[in-house]
């Protein structure tokens, strides 16, 4: 999807120029007021930008130069709002069929089963939990067979138990539904669990975009992460299980591997691992007889000094991937680190979550 639009919204000057992939989940991330919801309202056709161009695949949705503007009902885009917006006088069945101008019983059954709402079909919205309402809203959006699904902070209005109830269904959506999803959120946890791609926006502008691993590990993202969330995301391939201990070896490249807690995936499957920057220390000499199980040879790509905190952020290259380490200014001076140096990264902890997303 190609987006190049401008719009004046009160004090916000929206100026977006970005390409979104046509597969997987793309997270739109930013603080409140950054322009996240304004962007997807433009994509859906609910609002018209002042100028620009939008295409979805080969279809042009908006072109100010040629006076093209497809209304929402002709865009084939599903939209799930923060609040479910179900019709209270319709049953779940009635809500699911509303706006669906084609009948495909198999597609209906597949969506209902995927979202686990078979037992809700004859109930009314007033009897549903917040998580159940959102599942119905997602089902309604998917039943029109959209070319793209927009989700505007679908968990924001839910309490923690309802979020935990809905999250597994969103994870299944990411795996089972062959529809690109644009997912607006300000939750780092949701990004880590769901997103394949990421666009970070601030004050109506795109700050950085790309694969979620690369954006998460970018220098632009660092100021947005709380100290406890400063980390790297790496994609690794499952290799083997340790014959004695509950550990699995995963490969980052042909000569770089990590030991992680035992996973259920088969050899050759890909998983995502997360390494906190504060769990990475550096040494110029390969350590011996150490309790740390994961030691990687790395090359320093960037050195970012934060004088106020007496801290240094080091971006390391390990094969084709990157890893961040936070060390003290004292340690950096004593090791006399500079860009291009080879060092050994000692990794105290590596996490892998239950659904391959760290």
Swiss-Prot record:
<feature type="domain" description="ABC transporter">
    <location>
        <begin position="3"/>
        <end position="228"/>
    </location>
</feature>
<comment type="subunit">
    <text>The complex is composed of two ATP-binding proteins (ModC), two transmembrane proteins (ModB) and a solute-binding protein (ModA).</text>
</comment>
<dbReference type="InterPro" id="IPR003439">
    <property type="entry name" value="ABC_transporter-like_ATP-bd"/>
</dbReference>
<keyword id="KW-0547">Nucleotide-binding</keyword>
<keyword id="KW-0500">Molybdenum</keyword>
<keyword id="KW-1003">Cell membrane</keyword>
<dbReference type="GO" id="GO:0016887">
    <property type="term" value="F:ATP hydrolysis activity"/>
</dbReference>
<dbReference type="Pfam" id="PF00005">
    <property type="entry name" value="ABC_tran"/>
</dbReference>
<dbReference type="GO" id="GO:0005524">
    <property type="term" value="F:ATP binding"/>
</dbReference>
<feature type="binding site">
    <location>
        <begin position="30"/>
        <end position="37"/>
    </location>
    <ligand>
        <name>ATP</name>
    </ligand>
</feature>
<dbReference type="InterPro" id="IPR017871">
    <property type="entry name" value="ABC_transporter-like_CS"/>
</dbReference>
<comment type="similarity">
    <text>Belongs to the ABC transporter superfamily. Molybdate importer (TC 3.A.1.8) family.</text>
</comment>
<feature type="domain" description="Mop">
    <location>
        <begin position="289"/>
        <end position="356"/>
    </location>
</feature>
<dbReference type="InterPro" id="IPR027417">
    <property type="entry name" value="P-loop_NTPase"/>
</dbReference>
<protein>
    <recommendedName>
        <fullName>Molybdenum import ATP-binding protein ModC</fullName>
        <ecNumber>7.3.2.5</ecNumber>
    </recommendedName>
</protein>
<comment type="function">
    <text>Part of the ABC transporter complex ModABC involved in molybdenum import. Responsible for energy coupling to the transport system.</text>
</comment>
<dbReference type="InterPro" id="IPR005116">
    <property type="entry name" value="Transp-assoc_OB_typ1"/>
</dbReference>
<dbReference type="InterPro" id="IPR050334">
    <property type="entry name" value="Molybdenum_import_ModC"/>
</dbReference>
<keyword id="KW-0813">Transport</keyword>
<dbReference type="InterPro" id="IPR008995">
    <property type="entry name" value="Mo/tungstate-bd_C_term_dom"/>
</dbReference>
<dbReference type="GO" id="GO:0015412">
    <property type="term" value="F:ABC-type molybdate transporter activity"/>
</dbReference>
<keyword id="KW-0472">Membrane</keyword>
<keyword id="KW-1278">Translocase</keyword>
<keyword id="KW-0997">Cell inner membrane</keyword>
<dbReference type="GO" id="GO:0005886">
    <property type="term" value="C:plasma membrane"/>
</dbReference>
<dbReference type="InterPro" id="IPR003593">
    <property type="entry name" value="AAA+_ATPase"/>
</dbReference>
<keyword id="KW-0067">ATP-binding</keyword>
<dbReference type="InterPro" id="IPR004606">
    <property type="entry name" value="Mop_domain"/>
</dbReference>
<dbReference type="Pfam" id="PF03459">
    <property type="entry name" value="TOBE"/>
</dbReference>
<dbReference type="InterPro" id="IPR011868">
    <property type="entry name" value="ModC_ABC_ATP-bd"/>
</dbReference>
């Amino acid at each position: 999807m190609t987006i190049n639009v401008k719009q004046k919204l009160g004090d916000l000057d929206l100026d977006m120029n970005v390409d979104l992939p046509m597969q997987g989940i793309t997270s739109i991330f930013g603080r409140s007021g950054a322009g996240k919801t304004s962007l997807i309202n433009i994509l859906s056709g609910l609002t018209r930008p002042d100028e620009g161009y939008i295409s979805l695949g080969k279809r042009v949705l908006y072109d100010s130069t040629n006076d093209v503007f497809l209304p929402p009902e002709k865009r084939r885009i599903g939209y799930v709002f923060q609040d479910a917006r179900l019709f209270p006088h319709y049953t779940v069945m009635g809500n699911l069929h509303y706006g669906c101008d084609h009948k495909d019983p198999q597609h209906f059954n597949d969506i209902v089963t995927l979202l686990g709402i078979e037992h809700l079909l004859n109930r009314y919205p007033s009897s549903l939990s917040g998580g159940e309402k959102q599942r119905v809203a997602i089902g309604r959006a998917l039943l029109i067979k959209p070319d793209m699904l927009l989700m505007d902070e679908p968990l924001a209005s839910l309490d923690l138990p309802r979020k935990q109830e809905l999250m597994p269904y969103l994870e299944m959506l990411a795996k089972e539904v062959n529809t690109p999803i644009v997912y607006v959120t300000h939750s780092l946890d949701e990004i880590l669990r769901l997103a394949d791609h990421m666009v970070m926006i601030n004050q109506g502008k795109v700050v950085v975009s790309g694969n979620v691993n690369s954006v998460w590990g970018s220098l632009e993202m660092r100021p947005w992460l709380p100290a406890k969330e400063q980390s790297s995301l790496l994609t690794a391939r499952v290799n083997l299980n340790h014959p004695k201990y509950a550990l699995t070896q995963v490969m980052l490249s042909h000569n770089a591997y990590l030991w992680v807690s035992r996973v259920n995936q088969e050899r050759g499957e890909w998983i995502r691992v997360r390494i906190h920057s504060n769990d990475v220390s550096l040494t110029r000499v390969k350590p011996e007889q150490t309790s740390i199980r994961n030691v990687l040879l790395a090359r320093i790509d960037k050195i970012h000094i934060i004088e106020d905190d007496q801290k240094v952020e080091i971006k390391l290259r390990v094969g084709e991937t990157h890893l961040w380490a936070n060390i003290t200014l004292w340690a950096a001076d004593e090791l006399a680190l500079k860009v291009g140096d080879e060092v050994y990264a000692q990794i105290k902890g590596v996490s892998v979550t239950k659904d391959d997303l760290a």
